[in-house]
């Protein structure tokens, strides 16, 4: 008696082929994902400086330096206001290590004993609240450190000039207002002087009339 096993295997193979066959039907996804615009907050700023580095902050309680992360430090200038801020993010997690404005009066100095590092004080906002921090940053080369320090100092000085110009404009405005007020006061004084003789003439005429009346009464 012939075995029917091969025929059975053939039928199973055909069934598997039919199950795997592409019918061409389109299957709609269960969840539709929409594109989300990702913003970094740097869209309205131009990068003045962009360097690889490692940043530290001084822990006052522990009296020691603590690493904030390694990544790229940027000096970003706002396209409208002209203000410059320092921003650094960790290279892998993109967590913010530092985020503060460079304002007039700020200074940066070389770390003693290490020409590749420098430090400065700043009012930082990287943790979501303003804090006075002492930062130290280390670069791969002395040249990069010098470039950073020179640019930092240049920006701080330019902010000082801008501040003085603003104060100068405000002072000029006050002087101009003062001059206008003085002119108005002078005009009022002249008007008062012009009115004064007329008033005196009226009083003189009045006195003459009274004297004439007295003379007539006595006669």
From Swiss-Prot:
Keywords in alphabetical order: mRNA transport, Nuclear pore complex, Nucleus, Protein transport, Translocation, Transport
Spans annotated as Disordered: 1-30, 160-219
Location within or outside the cell: Nucleus, Nuclear pore complex
Domain spans labelled RanBD1: 26-161
UniProt xrefs under PANTHER family: E3 SUMO-PROTEIN LIGASE RANBP2, RAN BINDING PROTEIN
Coiled coil: none
Annotated transmembrane regions: none
Any one Gene Ontology cellular component term annotated for this protein: plastid
CDD domains hit by this protein: RanBD_RanBP1
Organism name: Arabidopsis thaliana (Mouse-ear cress)
Biased composition (Basic and acidic residues): 1-11, 185-219
Annotated gene: RANBP1C
SMART domains given in the database record: RanBD
GO biological process, one term: mRNA transport
Top-level taxonomic group: Eukaryota
Acidic residues composition-biased segments: 12-23
Record's protein name: Ran-binding protein 1 homolog c
């Amino acid at each position: 008696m012939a075995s029917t096993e091969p025929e059975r295997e053939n039928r199973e193979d055909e069934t598997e082929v039919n199950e795997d066959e592409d019918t061409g039907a389109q299957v709609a996804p269960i969840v539709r994902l929409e594109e989300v615009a990702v913003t970094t907050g740097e869209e309205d700023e131009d990068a003045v400086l962009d360097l690889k580095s490692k940043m530290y902050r001084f822990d006052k309680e522990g009296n020691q330096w603590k690493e904030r992360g390694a990544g790229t430090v940027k000096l970003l200038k706002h396209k409208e206001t002209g203000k410059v801020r320092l921003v650094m993010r960790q290279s892998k997690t993109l967590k913010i290590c530092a985020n503060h404005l460079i304002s007039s009066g700020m200074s940066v100095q070389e770390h003693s004993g290490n020409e590749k590092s420098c430090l400065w004080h700043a009012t930082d906002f990287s943790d979501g609240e303003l804090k006075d921090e002492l930062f130290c940053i280390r670069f791969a080369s002395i040249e990069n450190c010098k470039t950073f320090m020179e640019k930092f100092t240049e920006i701080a000085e330019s902010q000082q000039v801008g501040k003085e110009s603003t104060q100068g404009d405000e002072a000029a405005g006050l002087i101009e207002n003062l001059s206008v007020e003085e002119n108005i006061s002078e005009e009022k004084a002249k008007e008062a002087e012009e009115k004064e003789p007329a008033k005196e003439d009226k009083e003189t005429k009045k006195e003459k009339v009274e004297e004439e009346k007295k003379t007539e009464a006595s006669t």
